[in-house]
Amino acid sequence: PAVIHAPHHGHGVNPCAPAAYDNRPIKEIEAYVEEAMSQTLEAADVLGAETIVLHAGRYEPGADAAARETFAGFLDRHSDPRFALENLPAVYAGYPLLGNTAKDLTALAGETITHFCLDFPHLACTTNYRGLSFTEELERFDALNVTHHHLSNIRRGSITDEHLELDHPEGGLDLNAVVSRLRRHPAVPTTLEYKEDSPEVYARQARVFAGLWEGHARGGRD
């Protein structure tokens, strides 16, 4: 089935802090968000999508509590059982983002959202930024109802998600830990995400992914 990704702050929809980093009048922002989310749900209906991936968004430094409260209000207005809340990197381009770890997502979801999207490079960026163990934070997602995965690569030690290829020469994502999780959850779909909107790039990366999968099955570390 199709998977829908709701518009995020890069598209003008920033659930946890609609006016942050946005010069548009607040009324214009609110009207735009309403229309964009209506179109998102309509697209999911038309395509029969069972999953709508959602970002909590970015916020001004020091406004974490307000961002959490605003996101809760967003869910009150736009709740849908198909929402899958995605973990975001702790920071990007200098601004903080909301919902970085399994613990964060659980708190944000409350009883409203019951599905989650695990983005592996986002988690790696977060653990690099906070000095946490990637494998330990990854294991904490076992307690969540993860219904979708996002996969690409990041540079070694990076805190910035660049959607690099899996076989990038400077790649630093722990692919062995990632593939180990994927093999434990084979029914959960995985989307490969790259900057290049090219069929050739995705076709080659699908082959790279297949090699990682087969290599892990043979007991190799890729």
Q: Which residues does each PLM region occupy?
A:
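Acidic (Asp/Glu)-rich catalytic clusters
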Residues: 1-11, 38-48, 70-80, 106-113, ...
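Hydrophobic faces of well-ordered beta-strands that scaffold small-molecule active sites
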Residues: 2-6, 52-54, 83-86, 116-119, ...
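Active-site beta-loop-alpha junctions enriched in small/polar residues
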Residues: 7-9, 57-59, 88-92, 120-125, ...
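Active-site acidic/histidine proton-transfer and metal-coordination neighborhood
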Residues: 13-115
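Gly/Pro-rich active-site loop or hairpin
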Residues: 15-34, 95-99, 122-187
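A broadly tuned preference for mixed-charge, low-complexity surface segments
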Residues: 54-61, 104-107, 170-180, 200-206
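Short amphipathic alpha-helical "recognition" segments used for binding
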Residues: 90, 166-169, 197, 209
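C-terminal helical cap(s) of enzyme catalytic domains, especially alpha/beta-barrels
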Residues: 199-220
